[in-house]
């Protein structure tokens, strides 16, 4: 578990290294799906329509064939701006089958947010719902000048008529998903893919600070993390388990679980476009769901909400919480409510790690721990002050090396070199330690990143927004603890001299420009000056607990 190299301390996994196939994602996934052709793989949680493995595999190849007719080339980007839908699976894997890259973002993003994320990777194609298209159509050519075709995907048969009308009346840039897959699924070339070098997906992450950056993950990155996770999760799943697919597929946590691991293992996934507590619980009851992957706000519902008692949840065995830390108090409340019948598990990771690096093994829970190191990885704990490797039990920045570490940030070598050192270790930005049993503990989350409802909210993004207001001279944003939500943004603003501005005016101006979870639920305060270091760095910690009277 501890190894010494040139006098430096490193930590290995308790698990032996595993053999990870060097294959492209779609080759691996299609093989597993085709092996169980009659098994139900996906269920639409809105219509209850079921999709067999055979149907999903055929549709993946039809997507590839349709994209081939659109002249897709290796390395072309297809931007996915969709909620969780059954069509997500074939769109994702069909694009990769053609050597394309999928870049996935939140469908709730505003035009401004899309311009800072998806637009930066120059997608050639977009897959969107009608609602998203209506939001972006007037700015399409300005924000996405590289886009040649927009593929419209229906939700539960609700917008088919409108989509058909649009495809007839548009200037040819719009087509429906049904038109895309209207083929035999056979006429597409075999594209040569180098699993270790070729990018498969570009999700977005802020890292520990700053604006969002595209994270280039190779085919081998995500295949590796699928196998690494599966290795220590074998006892969690049973052959015919049904799982709930409520985590956003555009988030690396949901993507790896539902587009990779669950599909590979052949579990039935009930897909829900967005989390609605009653519908979520109804579906657990209806389909006898055994495992649900959740975020802390959903865990709090299981712990405290009275509606939970109205449903038969006896089939539920495991809740796996991720994306943000789950407190031991909430975990204990759930165990008490379900009389110890439910297993509560947690893991830890980052988009840059594809995403998992620690997972708590079944039956081996240690309170407060993020888990143990997955196989085929090496960890080191370094001193934030000196950069020296530290020993067991010593607190420092956690750094990870392994086949799941990203290729780098899209077109941003400087940012890549700041987080991946010369030896290939990714600096997580989190402070923690490892104990004598190989369990890792996070004692200080990355200071600047705000985690709201499991989503990353980079303060720098909101500060840039506030600073763009003509009456704002300076701004700083911090996270405020807010119970079920985790943290919410709180703004501090310096008004320009001889100008006047109210909190309501600033909120009314800012909120339409950002996704709902980024709203300033912690309020905005006006102060004389923003505290800064001698080098001009924002001293957020000085404002973290500062609570001045509002003007």
From Swiss-Prot:
Query: Pathway listed for it?
Result: Phytoalexin biosynthesis; 3,4',5-trihydroxystilbene biosynthesis; 3,4',5-trihydroxystilbene from trans-4-coumarate: step 1/2
* Cofactor(s) required for function per UniProt: Mg(2+)
Write out the residues that bind ATP.
205-209, 213, 346-347, 351, 430, 445, 537
Q: Please name the GO terms that the record assigns under molecular function.
A: 4-coumarate-CoA ligase activity; ATP binding; CoA-ligase activity
Q: Which domain of life is it from?
A: Eukaryota
Q: Which GO terms describe its biological process?
A: phenylpropanoid metabolic process
- Region described as SBD2: 347-409
Q: Which UniProt keywords apply?
A: ATP-binding, Ligase, Magnesium, Nucleotide-binding, Phenylpropanoid metabolism
Q: Where is this region: SBD1?
A: 276-346
User: Coiled-coil regions in this chain?
Assistant: none
What Enzyme Commission number(s) does the record list for this chain? 6.2.1.12
Residue positions binding (E)-4-coumaroyl-AMP: 253, 323, 346-347, 351, 447, 451
Q: Which reaction does it catalyse?
A: (E)-4-coumarate + ATP + CoA = (E)-4-coumaroyl-CoA + AMP + diphosphate; (E)-4-coumarate + ATP + H(+) = (E)-4-coumaroyl-AMP + diphosphate; (E)-4-coumaroyl-AMP + CoA = (E)-4-coumaroyl-CoA + AMP + H(+)
Q: Does the keyword Transferase apply?
A: no
Pfam family of the protein (one): AMP-binding
The record's listing under InterPro entries reads: AMP-bd_C, AMP-bd_C_sf, AMP-dep_synth/lig_dom
Q: For CoA, which residues are the binding ones? A: 274, 453-454
Q: What does this protein do?
A: Carboxylate--CoA ligase that may use 4-coumarate as substrate. Follows a two-step reaction mechanism, wherein the carboxylate substrate first undergoes adenylation by ATP, followed by a thioesterification in the presence of CoA to yield the final CoA thioester.
Annotated PANTHER family: AMP-BINDING DOMAIN-CONTAINING PROTEIN-RELATED, LONG-CHAIN-FATTY-ACID--COA LIGASE
What's written under domain? Both substrate-binding domains (SBD1 and SBD2) are involved in the substrate recognition, and are sufficient to confer the substrate specificity.
Family classification: Belongs to the ATP-dependent AMP-binding enzyme family.
Q: What is this protein called?
A: Probable 4-coumarate--CoA ligase 1
Source organism per UniProt: Dictyostelium discoideum (Social amoeba)
